[in-house]
């Protein structure tokens, strides 16, 4: 009732169905419409896309330097491109208006051809790459004021110190606290800390450093 389909016949039928007819769906990258050609060059939407980016038309200096650059490079093979550009710029400034005029005419002709070929062209200068932001977060507390806690007899007491002179005094206090002292040491520390806070509001850092070095904490025997 139903004929058995050979595998070779089935494969040939699939290939014949997938192959488009010649001339009916062929792709032609260039057309008579300059707008379509421009879209083809710029990736379909008129924007720059890699190697298909539309270049700006040459100005008078570029028209003149096109042959001059090749000439200078042949005469000085060891000269770098940046040095050649500087030399060409100096030579271009030394030319008279009459000597520059043929290159201005050629540049105008090239610009007219460019407008005819790419009517939707707009100059888009390349943006400079922005520096990447660091992932590290800035400290919430200023470096001039740091706060630490001192452990005295299993109790934490906040201790604030400013600048390097106060840090040195605080380190000496921590060393002295490490050797088991009476609990009234904490009271002395808190009183001295209150004194430092009151004096830091009206004294300069130099005066504060003098107070810290001249008045060490008193510890009862």
Swiss-Prot record:
DNA-binding annotation, residue ranges on this chain = 54-122
Q: Does the keyword Transcription regulation apply?
A: yes
Q: Which GO terms describe its biological process?
A: cell differentiation; male sex determination; sex differentiation
Q: Where is this region: Disordered?
A: 24-53, 195-221
Q: Which GO terms describe its molecular function?
A: calmodulin binding; DNA-binding transcription activator activity, RNA polymerase II-specific; RNA polymerase II cis-regulatory region sequence-specific DNA binding
Tell me where in or outside the cell this protein is found: Nucleus speckle; Cytoplasm; Nucleus
Principal subcellular localisation of the protein: nucleus
Q: Which UniProt keywords apply?
A: Activator, Calmodulin-binding, Cytoplasm, Differentiation, DNA-binding, Nucleus, Sexual differentiation, Transcription, Transcription regulation
Keyword Nucleus (UniProt): yes
GO CC annotation: what is one? cytoplasm
- Subunit architecture: Interacts with CALM, EP300, HDAC3, KPNB1, ZNF208 isoform KRAB-O, PARP1, SLC9A3R2 and WT1. The interaction with EP300 modulates its DNA-binding activity. The interaction with KPNB1 is sensitive to dissociation by Ran in the GTP-bound form. Interaction with PARP1 impaired its DNA-binding activity.
Return the similarity comment. Belongs to the SRY family.
Q: What does this protein do?
A: Transcriptional regulator that controls a genetic switch in male development. It is necessary and sufficient for initiating male sex determination by directing the development of supporting cell precursors (pre-Sertoli cells) as Sertoli rather than granulosa cells. Involved in different aspects of gene regulation including promoter activation or repression. Binds to the DNA consensus sequence 5'-[AT]AACAA[AT]-3'. SRY HMG box recognizes DNA by partial intercalation in the minor groove and promotes DNA bending. Also involved in pre-mRNA splicing.
Report the protein name in the record: Sex-determining region Y protein
Lineage here is: Eukaryota, Metazoa, Chordata, Craniata, Vertebrata
């Amino acid at each position: 009732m139903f004929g058995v389909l050979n595998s070779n016949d089935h494969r040939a039928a699939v290939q014949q169905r997938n192959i488009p007819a010649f001339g009916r769906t062929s792709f032609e990258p260039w057309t008579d419409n300059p707008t379509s050609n421009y879209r083809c060059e710029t990736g379909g939407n008129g924007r720059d896309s890699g190697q298909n980016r539309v270049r700006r038309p040459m100005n008078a200096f570029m028209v003149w330097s096109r042959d001059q650059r090749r000439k200078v490079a042949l005469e000085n093979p060891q000269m770098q491109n940046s040095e050649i550009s500087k030399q060409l710029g100096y030579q271009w400034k030394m030319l008279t208006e009459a000597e520059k005029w043929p290159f201005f005419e050629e540049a105008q002709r090239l610009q007219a051809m460019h407008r005819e070929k790419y009517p939707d062209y707009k100059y888009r200068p390349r943006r400079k790459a922005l520096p990447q932001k660091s992932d590290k977060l800035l400290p919430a507390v200023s470096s001039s004021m740091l706060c630490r806690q001192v452990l005295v007899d299993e109790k934490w007491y906040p201790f604030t110190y400013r600048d390097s002179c106060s840090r040195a005094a605080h380190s000496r206090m921590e060393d002295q606290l490490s050797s088991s002292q009476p609990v009234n040491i904490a009271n002395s520390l808190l009183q001295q800390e209150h004194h430092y806070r009151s004096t830091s509001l009206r004294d300069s850092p130099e005066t504060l450093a003098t107070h810290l070095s001249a008045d060490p904490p008193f510890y009862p025997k």
